[in-house]
């Protein structure tokens, strides 16, 4: 560039216009039709003063070419491309985003446009990079917040689990204390431990189970042996013993046998077994009944229970001596009728007649006879368990 071209440049209308903009900061300047400035260049003139000052320092440099000193080069960094008043060069839009333009075809023009583009395009691309960075930062922050929430949630869950464990241990200790109070044990200075309480409870359960099973076995064996008893009630230990009492001077038999009553009488009347049980729940232990060898040839004898009215009607004709004995024990009597009495078998071969008279809450009298004679001595032995009620 020679001095002539530089002089023309400094004296041009465009240069004067730029100086005027720098001094007055006119943002609304509109050029005339002959100055060759477009509306886009006018918009570009509204840039801050600092950028304009930098542009002025660039224009004052002697390294610029005359062809690239048109007004379009002043606003190529912000405009989409403007026409040249001198017609020397034209700026073309290269399709860059955010309106970056490249002007001129000369080497200096390319360098200048590249410099301008480097100053303008990063400002337009920066929002995209900023948005991506902000999204990454938000993602990291959200991950950090999520981790913090998880830690808080884990802490709450740990506290809840500890509370449940404490409640479970309290309930377990209360249950063991209740078990200690129920189980009998020797008092000690310290209370039983949990393992001692469980061991003691196990031993009690085992022993009680053995006792219950033994009782059940005994009851089952008794039912099997006494399956013919009336209503499940039998007269036990009603047997003859060696060396027992003598009936009317007849020696006693050494053989013994257990007897039980039939379900029904020969006359068809039902037998009330409740009167055979004592008040304490035990079965009636009858006195021993003895027989002599002379009585072994006697056939089946019957046992008959009568109401008190029937016994009073038949006392005079059947058992006068036994009647006197029964009057001494509550004016009760019993008679024997061999025609309608069920048999009472002793030792499988011997049978005797047995009469029983029962008073309501007064006393019991028993007489044994061989169709005619009575054995008054047996009465005193048979009612022995009931003497406390007389």
From Swiss-Prot:
Record SUPFAM superfamilies: HLH, helix-loop-helix DNA-binding domain (SSF47459)
Keyword NADP in record: no
InterPro entries: bHLH_dom, bHLH_transcription_factors, HLH_DNA-bd_sf
Expression tissues: Detected in the developing nervous system in the bilateral domains in the cephalic region that later on forms part of the ring gland. Concomitantly expressed in the larval central nervous system (CNS), including the dorsal chain neurons as well as several bilateral clusters of neurons: large, midline protocerebral brain cells (MC), lateral protocerebral brain cells (LC), ventral subesophageal neurons (SE) and lateral abdominal neurons, and the transverse nerves.
Keywords noted in UniProt: Cytoplasm, Developmental protein, Differentiation, DNA-binding, Glycoprotein, Transcription, Transcription regulation
Annotated compartments: Cytoplasm
Domain of life per record: Eukaryota
Biased composition (Basic and acidic residues): 151-163
Gene Ontology molecular function, alphabetical: DNA-binding transcription factor activity, RNA polymerase II-specific; E-box binding; protein dimerization activity
Cysteines engaged in disulfide bonds, as pairs: none
Biased composition (Low complexity): 69-78, 122-141
Domain bHLH: 156-208
GO cellular component: cytoplasm; nucleus
GO annotation, biological process: axon development; neuroendocrine cell differentiation; positive regulation of hormone secretion; positive regulation of peptide secretion; positive regulation of transcription by RNA polymerase II; regulation of DNA-templated transcription; sensory organ development; ventral cord development
Pfam families given in the database record: HLH (PF00010)
This protein's domain notes: The basic domain binds to the canonical E-box (5'-CANNTG-3'), with a particular preference for TA relative to AT or CG in the variable central nucleotide positions.
The protein's role, per its UniProt record: Transcription factor that regulates neurosecretory (NS) cell function and neuroendocrine cell fate. Acts as a master regulator of common NS functions such as Phm expression and neuropeptide production. Plays a role as a regulator of peptide-containing large dense-core vesicle (LDCV) production and peptidergic cell differentiation. Controls transcription of FMRFamide in Tv neuronal cells and Fur1 in Ap-let cells (Tvb and dorsal apterous cells). Also required for up-regulation of Phm in Tv and Ap-let cells, and expression of three neuropeptide genes, Ms, FMRFamide and Lk.
Record text on subunit structure and interactions: Forms homodimers via the bHLH domain. These dimers bind the core E-box sequence.
Name of protein: Protein dimmed
Gene responsible for this protein: dimm
